[in-house]
Amino acid sequence: MSEQQQTTIEMVDGLSEIADYMQDEELTAALTFIAKIIIKPDIPLNVATVEIVRLQAIAAKMAFKATWMANVDKNDRAKKNIYYTAAESINNLVSALKYIMR
């Protein structure tokens, strides 16, 4: 995790612990963006446009990883559940970003 990400993500209680536990760069990037939105919810439309695509791709990765961990690599139940939650939550965030684009 870069120092800039660490500073931003640490400003929102609980997110840095999740990032540290999961050790997943894309999830950390999504959590950092979530922290930025919590801190300053006014998102420029050009930023929202780029983030919609990026976050949707991250959510897809999270869903695939969770399914993989549920069906093939069944060793880490806790991480699997966090990936499921991340995929759903990021998809919900993407839906909200799409709404503000209208």
Model-based region annotation:
Residues 20-28, 42-46, 67-81:
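Charged, low-complexity interaction regions
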Residues 28-35, 50, 57, 64, ...:
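Periodic self-assembly scaffolds
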Residues 11, 18, 34, 55-58, ...:
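Amphipathic alpha-helices that form helix-helix packing interfaces
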Residues 44, 89-102:
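Amphipathic alpha-helical coiled-coil segments
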Residues 59-69, 90, 97:
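Non-transmembrane amphipathic alpha-helical segments
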Residues 4-11, 48-66:
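Short amphipathic alpha-helical heptad-repeat segments
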Residues 28-32, 53, 77-91:
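Short, charged, amphipathic alpha-helical segments
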Residues 3-35:
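Short terminal alpha-helical segments
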